[in-house]
Amino acid sequence: MKPLPVSIATRPRKYTPLSAYACLSDRNKFISVVFSFFFVSSSERVNMSEPEAEAQREPRDSSKKKKKKKKEKRKISEEEEKEEEEREQEEQVEKEEEKSESVLMRGIFKVGKKSHDVLLTPTRLTWTPIIPESPTGEESVVQAGVVLLQDVFAVKVKRRRMAGQQSGGAVLGLALFHSRRRGRRLEEDTLHLHNASAEHTHSWYNTLKELLTGFSCRPRYVKVFINPSSHKKEAVHIYRDHVAPLFKMADIRTDITADGTISVVPLFRLAAIKHTQPLTDRKGHALSVMKECKLDEYDGVVCVGGDGSVAELCHALVLRAQLDANSPENPVRAALPLGIIPAGSTDVVSCSVHGVRDPVTAALHVVLGHLQQVDMCSFLSNGQLVRFGFSAMFGFGGRSLARAEKKRWMSSSRRREYAVVKTLVRLRPEDCQLSFLPAKSSGSSLFGQQDQGEDKELDTKSAEESWVTNQGLYLSISIMSIPCLSPHAPQGLAPNTSLDTGSASLIAVGNASRSEFIKHLKRYSSSSGQFSFPFVETHSVSAVKIRPRSRIGWSEEESEDEGDSKNTPIIQSEAAALPWNIDGELVEIANEVLIRVHPRLIALYGEEVHEAESTVTCSCI
């Protein structure tokens, strides 16, 4: 081992207390230095004790030292050569991996103002600048460009046309439209390949088109639902300005259902859209349309709207699958994937599969056919299906939404802040019996990865033994099968769950003071810590039952005087309906609610993300 310089060995070291590995590394270095020191100095101590013998062995030792130095130099040079060979081998492996695919086409195009050698393989397109050899023979560093075909969604032939000319024109080359990732966003980008040869250009065009048609997950014909009344009534403009051009460029045919009172003629001119019938945006409208649609004609469904529109379409797709499979009792996996173009106020589901509220990102996920399997929940009361959804809030979340729905004339931000503050002022717990079935470690093994998303019946005895039941006062109970990311909660309302784990996150907030509960709510906007309170418990579950015992209907609560009723819930008649927030929609239920998780019940256009962009702040707490 080569000894380290004394200056390095004696240099004082600074240790980072938070990094045990750094300390361990320094300790190992210190041990090696000490070992080297003793190894070298041992001979010195012997030599000091035997000066006469040293004088006799000096010529012989000096020759040995020279030989050792030569050997060490050889070893060092050999090690350097080995390292260099390893680097070259790694680079060669990378190059071989790129070249292992058969080269389909090779040609010369101008990229920018320089000529490039362009290679096309079944998975990528690369271009390398053509640089003349230097007179001195020195090789210049050449940086090649690459675009994966999985990111390319369109290829067009570029032509020069005169003013008023509708077709034909001199061929200029090709334009490849592809996506480029910037953080969580997907952006449209264009690669221009210039070549004036019509035969050469069309040959490349035909080959590229054939390769792009090989991506079977990409939709060719989609059913589009637009909710013109969502949020700021911008859904039509969002679709026209951001989504329709991308669909047209990717040769995706669309069939739009929108409000007949909204003029959508510009959409038709822009994207060659076929519009079947104008319908209103009433509740249940998507469900009625989905029941009559011939779904086998489409490759997917696209929703332009907020969380309410998304929840209604997901519910409709699963119900339609049950109807087609003649399975009224067991949920069936939706036949078509759903694309979500965010046009609402929070867009929780969109953020959970895109990580950002951006219509271009959402549209590119649809165009490129990025599919993500997602779990859903069924909500039943008295044995009857209430609806399918992704999340539900009982207690604080339900009462806040009930108050917000009464102030529809306000803007969404003011309405939300008013509802939160008012509910905090009149904060009261719910006395209920909470039962849950813990999820197995294998995630979706409880219901199994069965075809069509059907549930397997559980053994009654074992199921009863595994249920965990608690009874008490709860300020809030949330059940979420997805993380529920949003700009208000970048890490999600349920950061301990995922999109396709086959389980849901149960978050039960027990009775606490108003100030402690507000601290809990504030933690959602930060990175972590919202579950570190003693009154908050979380569980990974596959089923939940909530049976209210003492309750008050939200309509009756509004008429009561304010008072300190934090510890004593007001008991009303058994028929009083309680507000539930299911996917942002207000649902009033008077009896026990059973929530069950169904693995991968629907496919959404998007991908798994763990954090959303934080662009919105709430000043109400």
Please describe what each predicted stretch is.
Residues L475-E516:
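Active-site beta-loop-alpha substructure in enzyme catalytic cores
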Residues F247, D251-V264, E585-L586, I595-I621:
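C-terminal helix/juxtamembrane-tail motif
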Residues K2-P5, R11-T16, Y21-D26, F39-V304, ...:
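ATP/NTP phosphate-donor binding region
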Residues E52, V236-H237, D241, A250, ...:
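Catalytic core of DAGKc-family lipid kinases
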Residues T10, T123-T126, P132-E133, R181, ...:
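Conserved beta-strand elements of beta-rich interaction domains across eukaryotes
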Residues G369, A419-P438, T501-A577, N581, ...:
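Catalytic phosphate-donor-binding core of small-molecule kinases
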Residues K114-P122, I479, T497, V593-V597:
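Broad, structure-driven detector of short, well-ordered beta-strand segments within folded domains
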Residues V103-M105, K110-K114, E139-V141, V157-R161, ...:
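Eukaryotic intrinsically disordered and solvent-exposed regulatory patches
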